[in-house]
Amino acid sequence: MSDTLPILIVDDQPKLLRLIIELMSRLGFPDVEGVSDGPEALKRMRERRYALVISDLAMAPLDGLQLLREIRADDSLMNTPFILTETSFDFEDINHAHVAGADAFILKPFDINLLKTKLKQVLNRKPRRREAPLPAESTLSQEFPLLGKF
């Protein structure tokens, strides 16, 4: 599935990081690397290409959303598929991540079948093209004012 490129997992909780790496291995990904924060993920991505990044949303000093924005703003990294994970997503989290260019969202704890499905969907997408600047941060209520009336 990964065309021999490695997968990068970013999570600040060591047990979850090891668990996700193990799940990826069970799904047939032979080369999976893990890091515990966004700055280290960016450093690694600038040194090596990755088939996919799976990142926790809530991390410090650079959270998953900030990491995603950095990746999408970099022409050499912008086509890297990106999945955000978290124990819960609220409406605003999903909206901000969608605007920033997330390819998928997965709730923790992972169901291996859902993970497998999301991986297939994300890894089979066409590369992005930089046609226009990324949209400014917005909320759906700003884009669709009538939503606030219901």
Residue map of PLM features:
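Two-component/phosphorelay signaling modules centered on CheY-like receiver
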Residues: P14-E33
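Acidic, metal-coordinating helix/loop segments flanking the phosphotransfer/catalytic sites
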Residues: G34-L52
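Receiver (REC) domain active-site loop signature in two-component systems and cognate sites
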Residues: M59
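Hydrophobic/aromatic residues positioned on beta-strands within the core alpha/beta folds
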Residues: T85-E86
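C-terminal output helix
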Residues: F110-L119
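CheY-like receiver
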Residues: N124-F150
